[in-house]
């Protein structure tokens, strides 16, 4: 079915003669066959969002509808790959057209010639339903790719064969109840705007270990949770996202560079192959899918890139994997929505954003969660969605930040003053929050006993108390404080500098296990408890603050994963001995 262009306005093209087309259908526009998607229909005229540069297009050019919605190809070959916002593989396009992507380039998302070794796990005669695993492919050394029956099919398996196949070759044949035969390949297609089905959704109960102490201990996120990372320019949103992509204890990471600088994607491409996953020793790239829709690419494709990423994540979730989707930045996506809304002459909402901004943001985040996967075997997978928000001037009262805060659970507020003070991660512990603290308390209690959560609450109380005392210090100076308040200020400083602050460039400190975090915080709070006891017995405050063990606590976070337990036990022993000596010295005086 084809129509004719009657209007071109930037990325928006209006064509007539498409009365039989549907909203969300993919179309080919003009002589270069640019990729577009129908946004709305009025009679036989269609408003089309074109995902490529439209210069040179004009009225009279032909538009052809494919009759298919915007879909992604799901199968072996996605991991370690880098796609643009509409799932075109950038390495293969570079081989075809060079560094600049030619308009209308049409390359399949999955390599059609590469052969994968398919190992059947289902047997002929098995009754299968949507989501059942029929075989596996060792896609990378870190990930076993499970080939599943598409969610819409069910029936009896009448043939299956193992061996080396391309993604389009038939590996099995399924006969449904009507007697129709369906050939199954290793590849599925799925519309990006429709979430993949699952059996049931459940409450997130396991934390996602990010290796970042301020996140894991103070503001944890659960696997299957949602989080926002808002902050002004230069406060470290992308660096936080990179750290999460590197060290999170998930099986697969989908990193969406949506409208941000190309150098940030380059950093990922250069660093990830060099870094190893702390859980299995494999290069991090083996578990990563990159979607690059950088600031110099067409704005319209940003809108698709978020949906492309979350659909790929749902596919891996259906295999029973824990997946993290990192979107950097959802603000650029919202700006793409605003531009298209303006071109469509829709009624603008606050600050020119469309009135449906909040519902679109909700559609993205609600696809996160912990699910019981479809299929007869019990599989549980999760999608954790973490979106960066870039409010102009760092003003989180703007519509994108506000809509995001109403939807997501965890809020890691980045602070430019902390970033400029070289405090990384620059997450403000006074304005951030996480409702998952109560949900995950049971898990922490089972792993570490009640002391973990008690220590967390004590640390938060000390940091909040320090904030109140700083007002007095600014007015009358530190000498006006009581010895107990001086100790609170000193402990808070230790918590800030020796616990919350991390060095992303030192291997020993870039990632902290839960146990190391627990022991480090316990050591700082033990100093606080012993110090209060010593001050009550008349110990000299200056002598207390200058003990050798306190200096060793400052270096304790750099202890290696193999030796930190012995190191921390030695520091605690030294601390008790030195504080006893300070008390004895105070009593003698």
Where are these regions (language model features)?
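Short, compositionally biased
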Residues: 40-45, 76-87, 143-163, 181-196
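Short histidine-centered loop motifs in beta-beta connectors
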Residues: 50, 55, 118-127, 156-166
């Amino acid at each position: 079915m084809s129509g004719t262009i009657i209007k071109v306005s930037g990325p928006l093209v209006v064509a007539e003669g498409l009365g039989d087309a549907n909203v969300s259908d993919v179309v080919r526009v003009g002589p270069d066959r640019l990729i577009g998607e129908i946004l709305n229909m009025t009679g036989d005229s269609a408003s089309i969002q074109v995902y490529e540069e439209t210069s040179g297009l004009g009225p009279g050019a032909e538009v052809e509808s494919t009759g298919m919605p915007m879909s992604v190809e799901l199968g072996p070959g996605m991991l370690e790959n880098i796609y643009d916002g509409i799932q075109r593989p950038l390495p293969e396009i570079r081989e075809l057209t060079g560094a600049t992507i030619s308009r209308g380039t049409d390359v399949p998302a999955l390599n059609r010639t590469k052969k994968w070794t398919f190992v059947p796990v289902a047997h002929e005669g098995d009754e299968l339903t949507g989501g059942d695993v029929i075989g596996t492919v060792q896609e990378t050394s870190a990930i076993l790719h499970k080939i599943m029956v598409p969610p819409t099919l069910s029936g009896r398996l009448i043939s299956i064969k193992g061996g080396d196949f391309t993604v389009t070759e038939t590996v099995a044949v399924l006969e449904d109840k009507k007697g129709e035969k369906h050939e199954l390949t290793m590849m599925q297609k799925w519309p990006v705007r429709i979430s993949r089905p699952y059996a049931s959704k459940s409450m997130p109960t396991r934390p996602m270990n990010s290796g970042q102490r301020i996140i894991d201990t103070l503001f944890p996120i659960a696997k299957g949770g949602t989080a926002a990372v808002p902050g002004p320019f230069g406060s470290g949103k992308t660096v936080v996202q990179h750290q999460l992509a590197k060290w999170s204890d998930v099986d697969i990471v989908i990193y969406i560079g949506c409208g941000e600088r190309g150098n940030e994607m380059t950093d990922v491409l250069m660093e990830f192959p060099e870094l190893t996953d702390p859980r299995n020793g494999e290069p991090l790239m083996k578990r990563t899918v990159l979607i690059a829709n950088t600031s110099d690419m067409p704005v319209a494709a940003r809108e698709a890139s978020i949906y492309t990423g979350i659909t790929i994540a749902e596919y891996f979730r259906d295999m029973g994997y824990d997946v993290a989707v990192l979107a950097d930045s959802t603000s650029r996506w919202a700006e793409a929505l605003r531009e298209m809304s303006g071109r469509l002459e829709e009624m603008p909402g606050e600050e020119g954003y469309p009135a449906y901004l909040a519902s679109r943001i909700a559609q993205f985040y609600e696809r996160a969660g912990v699910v019981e996967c479809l299929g007869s075997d019990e599989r549980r997978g999760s999608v954790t969605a973490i979106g960066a928000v870039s409010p102009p001037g760092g003003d989180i009262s703007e519509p994108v930040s506000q809509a995001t805060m109403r939807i997501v659970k965890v809020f890691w507020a980045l602070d430019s003053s902390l970033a400029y003070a070289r405090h990384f991660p620059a997450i403000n512990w006074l304005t951030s929050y996480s409702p998952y603290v109560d949900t995950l308390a049971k898990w922490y209690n089972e792993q570490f006993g009640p002391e973990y959560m008690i220590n967390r609450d004590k640390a938060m109380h000390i940091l909040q108390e320090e904030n109140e005392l700083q007002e007095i210090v600014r007015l009358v100076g530190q000498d006006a404080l009581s010895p107990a308040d001086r100790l609170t200020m000193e402990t808070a400083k230790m918590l800030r500098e020796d616990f919350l602050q991390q060095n992303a460039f030192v291997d020993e400190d870039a990632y902290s296990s839960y146990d190391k975090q627990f022991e480090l915080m316990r050591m700082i709070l033990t100093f606080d408890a012993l110090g209060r006891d010593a001050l009550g017995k008349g110990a000299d405050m200056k002598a207390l603050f200058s003990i050798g063990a306190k200096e060793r606590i400052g270096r304790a976070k750099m202890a290696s994963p193999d030796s930190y337990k012995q190191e921390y036990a030695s520091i605690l022993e030294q601390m008790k001995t030195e504080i006893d000596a300070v008390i004895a010295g105070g009593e003698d005086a």
